[in-house]
Amino acid sequence: MKRAKKYIHVQYYIIRNDEVWQDIEKVLIEKAHEGVEVRVLFDSMGCRTMHKRDWDRLKCEGIRVAEFFPAILGQLQMRVNYRNHRKIVVIDGKVGFVGGFNVGREYIGKDEKFGYWRDTHLCIEGAAVTSLAVRFVLDWNYAAHENLFLEDHLFEIPQYDRHGFDPVQIISSGPDSQTKTIHDNYLHLIHSARNHVYIQTPYFIPDASILDALKIASRSGVDVRIMIPCKPDHPFVYWATYSYIGEMVAAGAKCYVYNLSLIHISEPTRRTPIS
């Protein structure tokens, strides 16, 4: 962020006003004062512990702020899962961060309730950053009722030496999607697995199609393993997880409990990691 020249786009589901956010906020304000375009997009429900004055302070410093689904509207939604859980940072269209980390002290292992926090977050450079930049602009335009032009936030990607680099594809999905892109890709990967399917997730609540695909894979000789945390951050969801785990064990899958603390990332692997 400190090296940003044109823009910093920040999008999180949860932002807590603690020392982690305060360090980030300081950098964002400094860059805004330097003339860098800084935008912060937050989910209303996930950031409900933040106050209006916290966002107003950023606006006074020249930072653009937008709220995804204001809470009063979100509470009226029939589907409570219509929230924006994305965690994306895009810097100058050249560097992107995406993964499981929100902003708060628990995500760096400083919360007494959870202790050590197991998560995965990626730093991406190269052409794949374009997909993150586009995703942010689309979400921003929806939440802020603006019309940012994609062309203004995309950069010509330098030609990298492909030796030693793995291909990366960013896939997004949500209520605004006409197809269930992430779900359908998971389903395809499970059906096409020949060796193993390893899943590490805090919540294992698959729908019928994913559950059946995993059972079929396990019964067909594919090594299916599922790892869940020993500590829940949502108890009701956690106990529902155990119900599905029981079905998978009965189908021959191997299931493990991560004893150190909570696993937050959802990370299935087939032959190569997918997250």
Model region roles, listed by residue range:
Residues M1-R270, S275:
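Charged, low-complexity intrinsically disordered terminal segments
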